[in-house]
Amino acid sequence: LTDRTMAVAEMALWDLAGRMLNIPVWKLLGGYREKVPAYGSTMCGDEMAGGLATPADYGNFAEWMVNRGYKAIKLHTWMPPVSWAPSVKMDIKACAAVREAVGADFPLMLDANHWYSRVDALELGKGIQDLGYYWYEEPMDEHSTESYRWLAENLDIPIIGPEYAYGKFHTRAEWIAS
């Protein structure tokens, strides 16, 4: 089955449930909200003047987002084709610069762009955990739930799995079960 076929079936089932219960689907899904929390997000780092070329640039950009009213920030650090990326040490420096810029209680998250091995992902995770980051997203180029489970067992920070899980709905079911 394709994702499209599954989506059509899922929508039909939600519609059927709503009709059987005489409740609109939007209520079955939890109603609506007057406000939705949003967080600021950085682009991936680069090597261009005026971009996100240094940890200080990340700190300055974080201050800029705070001044515009964002209540949380998710960072995306450097990745190829940046000549020296990926680098655990540089990522930790950027994360530390942002933490210093926004203060100890400001919610921060890191999306590591799936560039790290298990060992490097653990080192980076410990670094941002010590900086009080809220979550750690997609640190490994890994689609195994076991690798992510191992990482989660070795850190005290929530781990977000990969955005792209190959294998369609069968793989997603494995992630949900984990």
Protein language model annotation of sequence segments:
Residues L1-M109, N113-W115, V119-L122, K126-D130, ...:
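N-terminal capping/lid subdomain adjacent to the active-site entrance of alpha/beta enzymes
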Residues L124-Y136, A177-S178:
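Structural recognition of alpha->loop->beta junctions
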Residues K74-H76, M109, N113, G132-H143, ...:
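Catalytic beta/alpha-barrel core
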Residues H143-Y148, A152-S178:
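Catalytic alpha/beta core domains of metabolic enzymes, predominantly
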